[in-house]
Protein backbone atom coordinates (compact mmCIF):
# COMPACT_ATOMS: atom_id res chain seq x y z
CA UNK A 1 0.00 0.00 0.00
CA UNK A 2 1.27 3.49 -0.81
CA UNK A 3 2.40 5.70 2.02
CA UNK A 4 -0.66 7.24 3.65
CA UNK A 5 -1.05 10.30 5.83
CA UNK A 6 -3.36 9.30 8.63
CA UNK A 7 -4.90 11.46 11.35
CA UNK A 8 -5.95 9.40 14.38
CA UNK A 9 -8.19 10.95 17.03
CA UNK A 10 -8.53 9.21 20.39
CA UNK A 11 -11.42 10.14 22.67
CA UNK A 12 -11.22 10.55 26.45
CA UNK A 13 -13.13 7.32 27.06
CA UNK A 14 -10.48 5.41 25.11
CA UNK A 15 -7.64 6.76 27.26
CA UNK A 16 -8.99 7.02 30.76
CA UNK A 17 -10.92 5.00 33.30
CA UNK A 18 -14.69 5.50 33.50
CA UNK A 19 -14.24 7.52 36.67
CA UNK A 20 -11.39 9.57 35.23
CA UNK A 21 -7.63 9.15 35.55
CA UNK A 22 -5.28 7.99 32.84
CA UNK A 23 -5.44 4.31 31.89
CA UNK A 24 -1.90 3.37 30.89
CA UNK A 25 -2.94 0.06 29.33
CA UNK A 26 -5.42 1.74 26.99
CA UNK A 27 -2.89 4.41 26.07
CA UNK A 28 -0.18 1.82 25.39
CA UNK A 29 -2.49 -0.13 23.10
CA UNK A 30 -2.97 2.96 20.90
CA UNK A 31 0.72 3.83 20.94
CA UNK A 32 1.67 0.32 19.85
CA UNK A 33 -0.80 0.50 16.94
CA UNK A 34 0.46 3.95 15.88
CA UNK A 35 4.08 2.79 16.11
CA UNK A 36 3.18 -0.18 13.89
CA UNK A 37 1.59 2.12 11.28
CA UNK A 38 4.75 4.21 11.29
CA UNK A 39 6.89 1.12 10.94
CA UNK A 40 4.82 0.28 7.86
CA UNK A 41 5.91 3.65 6.45
CA UNK A 42 2.79 5.74 7.03
CA UNK A 43 2.71 9.25 8.49
CA UNK A 44 0.57 9.48 11.61
CA UNK A 45 -0.71 12.60 13.34
CA UNK A 46 -2.42 11.98 16.68
CA UNK A 47 -5.22 14.14 18.08
CA UNK A 48 -5.63 13.21 21.69
CA UNK A 49 -8.37 14.04 24.16
CA UNK A 50 -8.17 13.08 27.80
CA UNK A 51 -6.47 16.05 29.45
CA UNK A 52 -9.49 17.02 31.56
CA UNK A 53 -10.39 13.39 32.29
CA UNK A 54 -6.82 12.54 33.28
CA UNK A 55 -6.34 15.65 35.39
CA UNK A 56 -9.46 16.18 37.47
CA UNK A 57 -8.74 13.34 39.93
CA UNK A 58 -5.14 14.33 40.68
CA UNK A 59 -6.36 17.93 41.12
CA UNK A 60 -8.80 16.79 43.80
CA UNK A 61 -12.15 16.77 41.97
CA UNK A 62 -14.39 13.73 42.61
CA UNK A 63 -15.90 13.96 39.07
CA UNK A 64 -15.31 15.82 35.80
CA UNK A 65 -15.63 19.49 36.78
CA UNK A 66 -18.47 21.45 35.20
CA UNK A 67 -17.07 24.99 35.53
CA UNK A 68 -14.82 26.35 32.80
CA UNK A 69 -12.10 27.24 35.29
CA UNK A 70 -12.30 23.75 36.79
CA UNK A 71 -11.92 22.08 33.38
CA UNK A 72 -9.11 24.41 32.38
CA UNK A 73 -7.23 23.70 35.58
CA UNK A 74 -7.82 19.95 35.24
CA UNK A 75 -6.55 20.09 31.66
CA UNK A 76 -3.35 21.80 32.79
CA UNK A 77 -2.69 18.87 35.13
CA UNK A 78 -3.89 16.15 32.77
CA UNK A 79 -2.13 17.38 29.64
CA UNK A 80 1.29 16.97 31.18
CA UNK A 81 0.36 13.53 32.53
CA UNK A 82 -0.84 12.56 29.06
CA UNK A 83 2.33 13.74 27.35
CA UNK A 84 4.53 12.07 29.93
CA UNK A 85 2.72 8.80 29.23
CA UNK A 86 2.87 9.22 25.43
CA UNK A 87 6.54 10.16 25.46
CA UNK A 88 7.59 7.15 27.46
CA UNK A 89 5.33 4.75 25.54
CA UNK A 90 6.50 5.97 22.10
CA UNK A 91 10.12 5.85 23.29
CA UNK A 92 9.73 2.08 23.77
CA UNK A 93 9.23 1.86 19.99
CA UNK A 94 12.02 4.31 19.21
CA UNK A 95 9.70 7.21 18.32
CA UNK A 96 9.75 10.76 19.66
CA UNK A 97 6.48 12.36 20.76
CA UNK A 98 5.88 16.06 20.03
CA UNK A 99 3.19 18.17 21.68
CA UNK A 100 1.13 20.82 19.87
CA UNK A 101 -1.63 22.67 21.72
CA UNK A 102 -3.97 24.59 19.44
CA UNK A 103 -6.71 27.16 19.75
CA UNK A 104 -9.25 28.08 17.11
CA UNK A 105 -7.52 31.39 16.45
CA UNK A 106 -4.50 29.43 15.19
CA UNK A 107 -6.67 28.45 12.24
CA UNK A 108 -7.84 32.02 11.63
CA UNK A 109 -4.38 33.51 11.25
CA UNK A 110 -2.65 32.63 7.99
CA UNK A 111 0.74 33.09 9.55
CA UNK A 112 0.05 30.68 12.41
CA UNK A 113 -1.57 28.29 10.00
CA UNK A 114 1.55 28.35 7.86
CA UNK A 115 3.81 27.86 10.86
CA UNK A 116 1.71 24.98 12.08
CA UNK A 117 1.92 23.29 8.71
CA UNK A 118 5.70 23.75 8.57
CA UNK A 119 6.11 22.44 12.12
CA UNK A 120 4.04 19.32 11.53
CA UNK A 121 5.73 18.63 8.22
CA UNK A 122 9.15 18.97 9.83
CA UNK A 123 8.17 16.69 12.70
CA UNK A 124 6.94 14.05 10.26
CA UNK A 125 10.06 14.35 8.12
CA UNK A 126 12.11 13.66 11.24
CA UNK A 127 10.08 10.61 12.19
CA UNK A 128 8.38 12.16 15.24
CA UNK A 129 4.74 11.73 16.20
CA UNK A 130 2.87 15.07 16.35
CA UNK A 131 0.39 14.86 19.22
CA UNK A 132 -2.27 17.56 19.15
CA UNK A 133 -4.85 18.65 21.69
CA UNK A 134 -6.82 21.80 22.13
CA UNK A 135 -5.05 24.28 24.39
CA UNK A 136 -7.87 23.87 26.90
CA UNK A 137 -6.32 25.95 29.67
CA UNK A 138 -6.33 29.14 27.59
CA UNK A 139 -9.24 28.54 25.19
CA UNK A 140 -12.14 30.93 25.50
CA UNK A 141 -15.46 29.11 25.44
CA UNK A 142 -16.88 30.85 22.36
CA UNK A 143 -13.67 30.20 20.48
CA UNK A 144 -13.13 26.52 21.10
CA UNK A 145 -13.23 23.93 18.33
CA UNK A 146 -16.35 22.52 19.95
CA UNK A 147 -14.47 19.32 20.63
CA UNK A 148 -11.53 17.31 19.41
CA UNK A 149 -13.63 15.55 16.77
CA UNK A 150 -13.93 18.87 14.92
CA UNK A 151 -10.29 19.74 15.62
CA UNK A 152 -9.22 16.42 14.08
CA UNK A 153 -11.33 17.06 10.97
CA UNK A 154 -9.77 20.50 10.50
CA UNK A 155 -6.27 19.10 10.96
CA UNK A 156 -6.96 16.22 8.55
CA UNK A 157 -8.22 18.70 5.97
CA UNK A 158 -5.36 21.10 6.15
CA UNK A 159 -2.72 18.35 6.11
CA UNK A 160 -4.45 16.69 3.11
CA UNK A 161 -4.69 13.49 5.08
CA UNK A 162 -5.71 10.29 3.32
CA UNK A 163 -7.81 9.16 6.24
CA UNK A 164 -9.25 10.36 9.53
CA UNK A 165 -9.71 7.62 12.12
CA UNK A 166 -11.90 8.51 15.12
CA UNK A 167 -11.22 5.92 17.81
CA UNK A 168 -13.89 5.79 20.45
CA UNK A 169 -15.51 3.44 22.97
CA UNK A 170 -18.11 2.12 20.53
CA UNK A 171 -17.74 0.13 17.33
CA UNK A 172 -19.27 2.65 14.97
CA UNK A 173 -22.32 4.70 14.25
CA UNK A 174 -25.78 3.22 14.96
CA UNK A 175 -29.17 4.48 13.87
CA UNK A 176 -29.83 5.31 17.54
CA UNK A 177 -27.65 5.38 20.65
CA UNK A 178 -27.11 1.65 21.39
CA UNK A 179 -26.45 2.39 25.05
CA UNK A 180 -30.06 3.48 25.46
CA UNK A 181 -31.67 1.57 22.57
CA UNK A 182 -30.70 -2.12 22.31
CA UNK A 183 -32.50 -2.41 18.94
CA UNK A 184 -30.13 0.09 17.32
CA UNK A 185 -28.52 -1.07 14.07
CA UNK A 186 -24.96 -0.35 13.04
CA UNK A 187 -23.98 1.28 9.76
CA UNK A 188 -20.94 -0.39 8.18
CA UNK A 189 -20.47 2.07 5.36
CA UNK A 190 -21.96 5.47 4.61
CA UNK A 191 -21.23 7.42 1.46
CA UNK A 192 -22.18 10.69 3.17
CA UNK A 193 -23.61 12.22 6.33
CA UNK A 194 -27.16 13.50 6.11
CA UNK A 195 -28.92 15.98 8.40
CA UNK A 196 -31.25 13.15 9.50
CA UNK A 197 -28.29 11.09 10.71
CA UNK A 198 -27.00 14.02 12.72
CA UNK A 199 -30.45 14.52 14.23
CA UNK A 200 -30.75 10.82 15.08
CA UNK A 201 -27.29 10.53 16.65
CA UNK A 202 -27.23 10.92 20.37
CA UNK A 203 -24.97 12.66 22.80
CA UNK A 204 -22.22 11.51 25.08
CA UNK A 205 -22.16 7.91 26.23
CA UNK A 206 -19.52 8.10 28.93
CA UNK A 207 -18.87 10.22 31.97
CA UNK A 208 -15.61 11.51 30.48
CA UNK A 209 -16.39 12.14 26.78
CA UNK A 210 -17.57 15.45 25.34
CA UNK A 211 -19.64 15.55 22.20
CA UNK A 212 -21.00 12.03 21.64
CA UNK A 213 -21.77 10.65 18.20
CA UNK A 214 -23.36 13.86 16.96
CA UNK A 215 -20.08 15.73 17.21
CA UNK A 216 -18.32 12.88 15.38
CA UNK A 217 -20.80 13.10 12.54
CA UNK A 218 -20.41 16.86 12.25
CA UNK A 219 -16.66 16.35 12.19
CA UNK A 220 -16.95 13.54 9.65
CA UNK A 221 -19.01 15.80 7.41
CA UNK A 222 -16.37 18.49 7.68
CA UNK A 223 -13.60 15.99 6.86
CA UNK A 224 -15.54 14.71 3.83
CA UNK A 225 -15.86 18.28 2.57
CA UNK A 226 -12.05 18.39 2.52
CA UNK A 227 -11.94 15.11 0.62
CA UNK A 228 -10.83 13.05 3.63
CA UNK A 229 -12.53 9.69 4.25
CA UNK A 230 -13.43 8.84 7.82
CA UNK A 231 -13.61 5.79 10.08
CA UNK A 232 -15.46 5.84 13.40
CA UNK A 233 -14.99 2.83 15.61
CA UNK A 234 -12.82 0.85 17.91
CA UNK A 235 -10.22 -1.89 18.02
CA UNK A 236 -7.41 -3.32 20.06
CA UNK A 237 -3.93 -4.62 19.55
CA UNK A 238 -0.91 -3.69 17.47
CA UNK A 239 -2.62 -4.17 14.10
CA UNK A 240 -5.90 -2.38 14.76
CA UNK A 241 -5.00 0.80 12.84
CA UNK A 242 -3.40 -1.10 9.98
CA UNK A 243 -6.57 -3.20 9.77
CA UNK A 244 -8.75 -0.08 9.77
CA UNK A 245 -6.67 1.38 6.95
CA UNK A 246 -7.02 -1.85 5.01
CA UNK A 247 -10.83 -1.69 5.31
CA UNK A 248 -11.07 -4.40 8.00
CA UNK A 249 -11.85 -2.20 11.01
CA UNK A 250 -14.65 -2.71 13.53
CA UNK A 251 -16.70 0.40 12.92
CA UNK A 252 -18.31 2.64 10.30
CA UNK A 253 -16.53 3.79 7.14
CA UNK A 254 -17.72 7.13 5.79
CA UNK A 255 -16.95 8.43 2.32
CA UNK A 256 -15.10 6.54 -0.35
CA UNK A 257 -13.14 3.49 0.89
CA UNK A 258 -9.72 4.65 2.02
CA UNK A 259 -7.51 3.52 -0.90
CA UNK A 260 -9.83 5.21 -3.39
CA UNK A 261 -9.80 8.43 -1.45
CA UNK A 262 -8.07 10.45 -4.16
CA UNK A 263 -10.92 9.78 -6.55
CA UNK A 264 -13.32 11.33 -4.10
CA UNK A 265 -11.29 14.49 -3.68
CA UNK A 266 -11.31 14.89 -7.45
CA UNK A 267 -15.04 14.35 -7.64
CA UNK A 268 -15.49 17.05 -5.10
CA UNK A 269 -13.28 19.43 -7.08
CA UNK A 270 -15.03 18.62 -10.34
CA UNK A 271 -18.65 18.61 -9.27
CA UNK A 272 -19.24 20.00 -5.81
CA UNK A 273 -16.78 22.70 -4.79
CA UNK A 274 -17.79 26.32 -5.41
CA UNK A 275 -15.57 27.86 -8.11
CA UNK A 276 -13.96 30.97 -6.67
CA UNK A 277 -11.95 32.37 -9.58
CA UNK A 278 -10.10 31.78 -12.81
CA UNK A 279 -6.48 31.33 -13.83
CA UNK A 280 -5.21 31.65 -17.40
CA UNK A 281 -2.20 29.52 -18.37
CA UNK A 282 0.22 29.64 -21.31
CA UNK A 283 0.47 26.87 -23.87
CA UNK A 284 3.46 25.23 -22.15
CA UNK A 285 1.54 24.88 -18.89
CA UNK A 286 -1.54 23.69 -20.75
CA UNK A 287 0.44 20.92 -22.38
CA UNK A 288 2.11 20.00 -19.09
CA UNK A 289 -1.30 19.70 -17.39
CA UNK A 290 -3.18 17.94 -20.14
CA UNK A 291 -0.58 15.81 -21.87
CA UNK A 292 2.19 15.21 -19.37
CA UNK A 293 0.31 14.76 -16.10
CA UNK A 294 2.22 17.56 -14.38
CA UNK A 295 1.23 20.10 -11.73
CA UNK A 296 0.60 23.76 -12.58
CA UNK A 297 3.57 25.95 -11.62
CA UNK A 298 3.59 29.76 -11.21
CA UNK A 299 5.76 30.15 -14.33
CA UNK A 300 2.88 29.02 -16.56
CA UNK A 301 0.25 31.41 -15.17
CA UNK A 302 -0.45 34.48 -17.31
CA UNK A 303 -3.56 35.98 -15.70
CA UNK A 304 -5.58 35.70 -12.49
CA UNK A 305 -9.15 36.79 -11.88
CA UNK A 306 -11.50 36.58 -8.92
CA UNK A 307 -10.75 37.06 -5.24
CA UNK A 308 -10.02 33.50 -4.15
CA UNK A 309 -8.22 32.25 -1.06
CA UNK A 310 -5.58 29.55 -0.95
CA UNK A 311 -7.24 26.09 -1.11
CA UNK A 312 -10.25 27.45 -3.01
CA UNK A 313 -11.17 25.77 -6.26
CA UNK A 314 -10.65 27.73 -9.48
CA UNK A 315 -11.20 27.16 -13.18
CA UNK A 316 -8.17 27.05 -15.43
CA UNK A 317 -8.45 28.39 -18.97
CA UNK A 318 -5.99 28.32 -21.87
CA UNK A 319 -4.81 31.22 -24.00
CA UNK A 320 -7.93 30.90 -26.15
CA UNK A 321 -10.14 31.28 -23.09
CA UNK A 322 -11.30 27.65 -23.15
CA UNK A 323 -11.73 26.00 -19.75
CA UNK A 324 -9.37 23.02 -19.60
CA UNK A 325 -9.73 21.98 -15.98
CA UNK A 326 -10.33 22.86 -12.40
CA UNK A 327 -8.22 22.61 -9.29
CA UNK A 328 -7.55 23.60 -5.74
CA UNK A 329 -4.96 26.39 -5.49
CA UNK A 330 -2.13 26.77 -3.02
CA UNK A 331 -2.01 30.57 -3.52
CA UNK A 332 -4.56 33.30 -2.79
CA UNK A 333 -5.45 35.45 -5.83
CA UNK A 334 -3.54 38.48 -4.55
CA UNK A 335 -0.38 36.41 -4.03
CA UNK A 336 -0.70 34.60 -7.32
CA UNK A 337 -0.89 37.93 -9.14
CA UNK A 338 2.49 38.80 -7.60
CA UNK A 339 4.19 35.55 -8.58
CA UNK A 340 2.62 34.63 -11.92
CA UNK A 341 5.30 33.92 -14.50
CA UNK A 342 8.00 33.57 -11.79
CA UNK A 343 10.19 30.59 -10.95
CA UNK A 344 8.71 28.25 -8.31
CA UNK A 345 11.53 28.75 -5.82
CA UNK A 346 10.87 32.50 -5.72
CA UNK A 347 7.11 32.08 -5.62
CA UNK A 348 6.71 29.45 -2.91
CA UNK A 349 7.20 31.89 -0.02
CA UNK A 350 3.78 33.34 -0.96
CA UNK A 351 2.03 29.98 -0.84
CA UNK A 352 0.73 29.39 2.65
CA UNK A 353 1.72 25.77 2.50
CA UNK A 354 5.17 26.69 1.14
CA UNK A 355 4.28 24.52 -1.82
CA UNK A 356 5.74 25.58 -5.14
CA UNK A 357 2.78 24.37 -7.21
CA UNK A 358 -0.16 26.63 -8.01
CA UNK A 359 -2.29 23.50 -8.41
CA UNK A 360 -0.81 20.19 -7.42
CA UNK A 361 -1.55 17.24 -9.66
CA UNK A 362 -3.49 15.55 -6.86
CA UNK A 363 -5.84 18.52 -6.72
CA UNK A 364 -6.36 18.83 -10.46
CA UNK A 365 -9.22 17.61 -12.64
CA UNK A 366 -9.07 17.80 -16.42
CA UNK A 367 -12.32 18.98 -17.96
CA UNK A 368 -11.33 19.19 -21.68
CA UNK A 369 -8.42 17.43 -23.25
CA UNK A 370 -9.11 17.92 -26.92
CA UNK A 371 -8.55 21.67 -26.68
CA UNK A 372 -4.73 21.78 -26.31
CA UNK A 373 -3.39 24.97 -27.96
CA UNK A 374 -1.06 24.38 -30.86
N1 LIG B 1 -26.12 6.82 17.10
C1 LIG B 1 -25.09 6.49 17.89
N2 LIG B 1 -24.26 5.49 17.53
C2 LIG B 1 -23.21 5.16 18.31
N3 LIG B 1 -22.93 5.76 19.49
C3 LIG B 1 -23.73 6.76 19.92
C4 LIG B 1 -24.84 7.16 19.13
N4 LIG B 1 -25.42 8.18 19.77
C5 LIG B 1 -24.73 8.42 20.90
N5 LIG B 1 -23.69 7.57 21.01
C6 LIG B 1 -22.76 7.56 22.12
O1 LIG B 1 -21.56 8.24 21.71
C7 LIG B 1 -20.51 7.74 22.54
C8 LIG B 1 -19.16 8.15 21.98
O2 LIG B 1 -19.01 9.54 22.13
P1 LIG B 1 -18.06 10.19 23.28
O3 LIG B 1 -18.47 9.67 24.61
O4 LIG B 1 -18.04 11.64 23.06
O5 LIG B 1 -16.68 9.51 22.89
P2 LIG B 1 -15.18 10.03 22.82
O6 LIG B 1 -14.75 10.31 24.22
O7 LIG B 1 -14.47 8.87 22.22
O8 LIG B 1 -15.12 11.26 21.93
C9 LIG B 1 -20.79 6.27 22.60
O9 LIG B 1 -20.29 5.71 23.77
C10 LIG B 1 -22.33 6.19 22.56
O10 LIG B 1 -22.90 5.96 23.82
N1 LIG C 1 -9.50 18.80 24.93
C1 LIG C 1 -10.29 17.99 25.83
C2 LIG C 1 -11.09 16.96 25.10
C3 LIG C 1 -12.35 17.43 24.49
C4 LIG C 1 -13.05 16.31 23.75
O1 LIG C 1 -13.48 16.50 22.61
O2 LIG C 1 -13.17 15.09 24.35
P1 LIG C 1 -13.70 13.73 23.65
O3 LIG C 1 -15.16 13.88 23.33
O4 LIG C 1 -13.42 12.67 24.65
O5 LIG C 1 -12.89 13.54 22.40
C5 LIG C 1 -9.39 17.20 26.78
O6 LIG C 1 -8.24 16.90 26.43
O7 LIG C 1 -9.86 16.86 27.85
Curated annotation (Swiss-Prot):
GO cellular component terms attached to this protein's record: cytosol
Cross-referenced Gene3D superfamilies: Acetylglutamate kinase-like, PUA domain
Pfam entry (one): PUA
Keywords per UniProt: Amino-acid biosynthesis, ATP-binding, Cytoplasm, Kinase, Nucleotide-binding, Proline biosynthesis, Transferase
Keyword Cytoplasm appears in the UniProt entry: yes
Enzyme nomenclature, EC number: 2.7.2.11
Compartment list: Cytoplasm
Residues annotated for ATP binding in this entry: 9, 168-169, 210-216
Catalytic activity: L-glutamate + ATP = L-glutamyl 5-phosphate + ADP
CDD domains the UniProt entry points to: AAK_G5K_ProB (cd04242), PUA_G5K (cd21157)
Keyword Manganese: no
InterPro entries: AceGlu_kinase-like_sf, Asp/Glu/Uridylate_kinase, G5K_ProB, Glu/AcGlu_kinase, Glu_5kinase, Glu_5kinase/COase_Synthase, Glutamate_5-kinase_CS, PUA
Binding, substrate: 49, 136, 148
Any Gene Ontology biological process: L-proline biosynthetic process
Pathway: Amino-acid biosynthesis; L-proline biosynthesis; L-glutamate 5-semialdehyde from L-glutamate: step 1/2
GO molecular function, one term: ATP binding
Domain of life: Bacteria
Family statement: Belongs to the glutamate 5-kinase family.
PANTHER family attached to this UniProt entry: GLUTAMATE 5-KINASE (PTHR43654), ISOPENTENYL PHOSPHATE KINASE (PTHR43654:SF1)
Protein name: Glutamate 5-kinase
